[in-house]
């Protein structure tokens, strides 16, 4: 079983990493190619391309200038400890044991506009480049064209090493990021957990809650060493419960109703 997550825009490079071990990203050469293109942009170009404020654009202009193809703890931090958004509040990697992080290293992957596909302990230099950014490059009009089937092939390599267990990809990523994966080329079926909250007289996806819940699901899989999709139906953290009637073989729906 492989779990894929989206990255986070918010990053934490202030809190010291609680584990010393780290690995190097697989697609450094590809990331370097993107950085070369990003370095040609002015801060105003970046602000327009990414629809961000001028201060954020200047910050990322400097990040691209500082980025190096050589990774070390001096200029980078393990991805799962550097990302700091809603998903990663749910996953809460800083409280995982060394054994849990080792398991996550084998089973969790983070999709990234710049780095393609990251393992939890892959070193990450600070950046901003969302997968949906229409950044024209030598391979096409956007990042989906840039990555092509590279991410899918990398996932297949990892799925194909899973002998004796169910080969399945659990999609805990956003739609924007999962578009970088080509399900028809995957060597495994996809199961997508969907989290809905009761609001305004019906169940709906509330972004903040859904992101956090996807992180909780990834942590649940890691801590419980889940290997079969059926076991995902037992997930019941923070009052979510599996709804069989709303689910099917590829979409597992979890709902909660707190108050009225």
UniProtKB/Swiss-Prot annotation:
GO terms for cellular component: cytosol. Disulfide bonds: none annotated. It comes from the Bacteria. Pfam families: H2O2_YaaD. GO terms for biological process: response to hydroperoxide. Coiled coil: none annotated. Belongs to the UPF0246 family. This is UPF0246 protein Bamb_2261. It comes from Burkholderia ambifaria (strain ATCC BAA-244 / DSM 16087 / CCUG 44356 / LMG 19182 / AMMD) (Burkholderia cepacia (strain AMMD)). The lineage of its organism: Bacteria, Pseudomonadati, Pseudomonadota, Betaproteobacteria, Burkholderiales.
